[in-house]
Each structure stands twice: as structure tokens, then as C-alpha cells.
């Protein structure tokens, strides 16, 4: 299916993306950070779910969900298809940057066959809606090695200049 977003053009296998993404949504992580994301994202960024759905991606089925802090997130969605033309303007949904990376350039740990591209959604700030204190959440996100990896990832992302095909 051909999809246009601003001056970007995509050819996407929506049915395959829906099949994979809905399976991931049914089997997603239940740590506090992820539960907070699933609970807060729709009310905070109401246009994000319909935007991702155009590509067949379920907002609750990211391939990777990275909390940089308890309320700062980046969600990565692998989209089967091709970027036909990269736009000259960055994509924003509800003020959130959406960075598009083609295939293996995205540095995602995946066994999926190409062609695919990755949509990195965020950084997005969400309110903390859970009753537990985020400092008490048991998650890899509280480990120093994870935080160091996320810091490195963020610094690399800043260098992407929000346009990377």
C-alpha cells in the first residue's frame, strides 16, 4: 500500500505489519515502565495510534520500548516495506519526532527479512500514572549498563539530525 506523509513516500505491507504488531501487543512487557507507556500514551498523544495504524503498527506492539527516564520514552517499530522517497522535512506527530531509518541501518536486533524500515518515535514525555514509585520498578531500565546504552543511543540519535534514510 502506498502511503504519503508530508513529502515522504512509503510502500508498506500493512497486512503483514498488522499480523506481527498485534502479536507483539498481545505479548508485551509488563514492567512498570512499559505498563505506564501503554496506559498514558493514548491520552497524551492522541494522533500517534492512528498514525502508526496507517502502517499496520499497533502502538502497544513496539519492537523496542526504551525508557530513558521513568517518563521519557522512545518506541521503535519495524515496518515491512520500503521508503520510496525521503522527505525534506522531519515527521512530527503531536509534536513528537518520528525518525525513519532504512533496514539494517537502524541497528535493531531483528531476524526479519528485508525490506523493512524502522520508525523511531520520540523522545516523548508521558505522565507517570501508576501507583508504584518509578524508582521501585524492577526493570532492566534501572540497571547502570542499560542507562549507559540508552545515553549512547540518544547521543547517536541526536547526530541523525532527524532525517536518515
Language-model-derived ranges and their functions:
Residues 32, 80, 120:
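Residues in well-ordered beta-strands of folded domains
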Residues 27-72:
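Short, well-structured hydrophobic secondary-structure segments
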Residues 36, 82-86, 124-126:
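Generic structural motif
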Residues 59-116:
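Amphipathic protein-protein interaction modules
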Residues 101-165:
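Glycine-rich, aromatic-bearing surface loops/beta-hairpins
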Residues 48-52, 79, 150:
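Generic structural signal of hydrophobic/aromatic residues within well-ordered alpha-helices
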Residues 1-42:
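Long, hydrophobic N-terminal alpha-helical segment
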Amino acid at each position: 500500500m502506498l502511503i504519503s506523509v508530508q513529502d515522504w513516500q512509503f510502500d508498506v505491507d500493512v497486512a503483514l505489519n498488522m499480523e506481527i504488531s498485534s502479536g507483539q501487543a498481545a505479548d508485551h512487557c509488563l514492567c512498570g515502565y512499559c505498563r505506564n507507556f501503554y496506559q498514558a500514551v493514548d491520552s497524551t498523544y492522541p494522533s500517534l495510534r492512528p498514525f502508526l495504524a496507517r502502517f499496520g503498527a499497533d502502538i502497544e506492539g513496539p519492537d523496542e520500548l526504551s525508557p530513558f527516564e521513568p517518563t521519557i520514552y522512545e518506541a521503535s517499530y519495524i515496518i515491512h516495506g520500503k521508503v520510496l522517497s525521503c522527505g525534506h522535512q522531519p515527521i512530527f506527530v503531536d509534536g513528537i519526532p518520528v525518525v525513519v531509518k532504512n533496514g539494517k541501518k537502524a541497528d535493531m536486533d531483528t531476524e526479519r527479512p528485508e525490506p523493512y524500515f524502522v520508525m523511531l518515535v520520540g523522545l516523548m514525555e508521558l505522565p507517570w500514572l501508576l501507583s508504584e514509585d518509578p524508582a521501585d520498578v524492577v526493570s532492566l531500565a534501572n540497571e547502570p549498563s542499560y542507562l549507559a546504552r540508552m545515553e549512547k543511543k540518544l547521543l547517536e540519535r541526536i547526530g541523525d539530525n532527524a532525517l536518515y534514510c
